[in-house]
């Protein structure tokens, strides 16, 4: 098992993180006794990677950039929109964009060595593209991995999150999420806001890495709108340095209405209405969480996400 985030800051505004093996922990009866059962997520050991060679437009330098995707070992050369390969359920914040004819990339998740294999290094950095009279954007890009996929290329500067398809079908009820992680914080007491559409600002409060795991019971109406009840919730924030790698960290999944639970935090664990998925018609629609499921309900989808930057 390998693990989640090594997050620190350098060169003004950069954060880094590492992540690898993620598994779900279930309790299965065995000869009348409860027995732990660890169920790995496909490619969740982070030992296999697809490396994409994307050639950016000459007007912004014409550089060849490497984009890393979690999936079967493979190299892809050319500006080809990426679709998940080999049955990989993993999406990343690495994307190819083509805005007003200009090809630009963002890579904030990297393949990184750990022991005899690999892990994922998640980085938050400032990404900028400027072409006189055409485009002028500077934005803080967080490193993230999630279960789902991204529709490429990104073609506009607004509502890019609609290209993301959050979550994958899942009907089990895991007891916990387990992985290894390593954390080193920036030490800065405040965050920055840099959206690409306004001046650089400051946000009170320390930055942190965060992992969320949501189980949802989704429903689609005749018009293709999707609502969901929250079945299970697990959220953990990392705001302190770890003492090297922490192996086998295990976090309990809470079921049903957790608003009275001592660990409940509305900002990070509350019902959401900002994630997108594709409906049965192939349209990108907002997932509207309308309430908490009963404590014994089964989900239809799961959404694990890890970020190197707190985005609420």
Describe each PLM feature range.
Residues 9-40:
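Bacterial Sec-dependent N-terminal signal peptides
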Residues 17, 21, 25, 299-307, ...:
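Intrinsically disordered, low-complexity repeat segments enriched in small/polar residues
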Residues 199-201:
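Extended catalytic cores and adjacent scaffolds of nucleotide/polyanion-binding enzymes
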Residues 180-186:
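Solvent-exposed strand-to-loop "edge" motifs in beta-rich extracellular domains
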Residues 35-174, 178, 204-303, 310:
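Aromatic (Trp/Tyr/Phe) and Gly/Pro-enriched flexible surface segments
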Residues 188-196, 206-213:
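Beta-strand acidic-aromatic groove motif in beta-rich domains, primarily in extracellular
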Residues 2-11, 308-312:
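Conserved small/polar residues in nucleotide/adenosyl-binding loops
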